[in-house]
Structure formats: structure tokens, C-alpha cells
């Protein structure tokens, strides 16, 4: 449990995450934010579903503690962050708390909801970092939130795409991030873990603040020096595609659940 919690940056094994995210090149940060999380959660599910399911009572409360601590610390610590990569570090800690909440139920529906959550989380992070890769001044990627001031005036489509990604990260309906959290909370409630569900809902509201703050900077602050023209259309396409996926997910929200059922993961 300690090794896996460290892998996914869950509290109290999260200490390395903010400094590593902020100090690493943006390309490395994007890797840390996506790939290890997918792998770590997949291994988490594999171990908890099969070898350890018969001893649920011995590890469930440990995961509940890790989940609650991660959701609270991630949501609260991110509020005053001004560096984009440091903010996304605390955001990832909070999101891993939600994912672990699903695992802590020890049920098939909880494991499925966590798989769906991590897939949607990955799509949201792909969109977020695609935006960051596009934002360059003098050959340097954007680092601080205030550097995005008024960007909607110069890059309206990119700003709109990031708005969709941020609202999805915040869990605002009808975006994909809302359904990701909805499935987690439903599996938690079905398992009778009402306190965990309530804390998850409260931290969701708190975390919405720092996502909306970025939107406020983009749309309502005075514009700064424009960023360089977009030259990598592959990355631009990734941003647009991820935002379309997140915005249109409500049309067929059961797609991941059906795929997981068909391939007999459980």
C-alpha cells in the first residue's frame, strides 16, 4: 500500500510531488501527471480486487484515510498556488483521493468507477498540458497563472478549450469530469460509506475555486503580451479533441462502463 500510494502521490506520501512537478521540464511534468497515475491505479485495482479482497476489513480503513487526506490536502493546498505546475500537482493529489475512494469500497462497481475516473482524468490532463505546450513566450512555456491574463482575447478557441478542461476537472455538469466523480460517489454511497461521500462532495466544491480562478484570469483580466503563434498543430489538435470529448461525453456516458464489461476486466 505504501509503495502504490507513493506512486500515485497520495497523502501522506505526496511530499515529493509539488517540487518535482514545478522543478521538472514541462514535458516531464506532463508525463508524471498522467502515465504513473494510470499505472499506479491499475496495479492498485489489480491487487485489491484479487489477492487482498478477502481481507477487505484489514485495508479498507487505511484506504479511506488516504482518500480523505488526499482530497482535503489537494483541494486546500492548491487554493493559493500561483505556479501552474505546482497547482496541477496538488490537483493530482486531490484527484487520486477520489480514485482511491472508489477502490476503498472493495466492490466491483467501485473498481469500475475508478477505472472510468482515471481514463477521464487522463483525458483532462492531456488537454491541460496540450494547452500549456502551446503557450510560449520567447521560447519558454507558461509557468505562472497570471501569464494567462486576457488570453481569451488573442486565442479564443484555445481559451475556450481550456475552460472546458478546467470545468471538467472541477466536476461541473454535464462535462465528463462530472460523470467521473458521479460514478465514484455512487459506488461509495452504495457501500454505505456516507461520510467519505460527503467529504468528497465538499472538497469538490472547494477545488472548483482554483479552477475557476484560472478562467477568471483568462477572460476578465487585462491582456498581456501575446503568446507566440501556434506552430504544432498536433498538440493544438490534442487540445481541441480532448475538449470535444469532455464536452460531448454526456451524450453516451456509459461507454466506458460497457467497454470494461465487454472485455471482462472483472
Language-model region placement:
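Alpha-helical transmembrane segments of multi-pass membrane proteins predominantly involved
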Residues: 1-266
Amino acid at each position: 500500500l505504501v509503495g502504490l500510494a507513493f506512486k500515485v502521490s497520495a497523502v501522506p506520501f505526496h511530499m515529493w510531488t509539488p517540487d518535482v512537478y514545478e522543478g521538472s521540464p514541462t514535458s516531464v511534468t506532463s508525463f508524471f501527471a498522467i502515465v504513473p497515475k494510470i499505472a499506479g491505479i491499475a496495479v492498485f485495482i489489480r491487487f485489491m480486487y484479487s489477492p487482498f479482497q478477502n481481507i477487505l476489513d484489514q485495508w479498507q480503513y487505511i484506504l479511506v484515510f488516504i482518500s480523505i487526506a488526499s482530497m482535503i490536502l489537494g483541494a486546500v493546498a492548491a487554493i493559493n498556488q500561483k505556479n501552474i505546475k505546482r497547482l496541477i500537482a496538488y490537483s493530482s493529489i486531490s484527484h487520486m483521493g477520489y480514485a482511491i475512494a472508489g477502490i476503498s469500497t472493495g466492490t466491483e462497481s467501485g473498481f469500475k468507477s475508478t477505472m472510468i475516473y482515471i481514463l477521464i482524468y487522463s483525458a483532462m490532463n492531456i488537454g491541460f498540458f496540450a494547452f500549456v505546450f502551446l503557450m510560449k513566450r520567447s521560447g519558454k512555456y507558461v509557468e505562472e497563472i497570471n501569464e494567462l491574463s486576457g488570453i481569451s482575447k488573442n486565442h479564443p478557441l484555445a481559451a475556450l478549450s481550456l475552460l472546458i478542461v478546467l470545468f471538467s476537472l472541477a466536476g461541473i455538469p454535464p462535462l465528463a469530469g462530472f460523470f467521473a466523480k458521479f460514478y465514484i460517489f455512487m459506488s461509495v454511497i452504495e457501500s454505505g460509506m456516507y461520510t467519505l461521500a460527503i467529504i468528497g462532495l465538499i472538497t469538490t466544491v472547494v477545488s472548483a475555486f482554483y479552477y475557476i480562478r484560472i478562467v477568471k484570469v483568462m477572460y476578465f483580466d487585462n491582456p498581456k503580451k501575446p503568446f507566440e503563434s501556434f506552430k504544432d498543430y498536433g498538440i493544438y489538435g490534442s487540445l481541441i479533441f480532448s475538449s470535444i470529448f469532455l464536452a460531448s461525453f454526456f451524450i453516451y456516458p456509459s461507454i466506458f462502463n460497457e467497454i470494461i464489461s465487454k472485455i471482462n476486466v472483472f
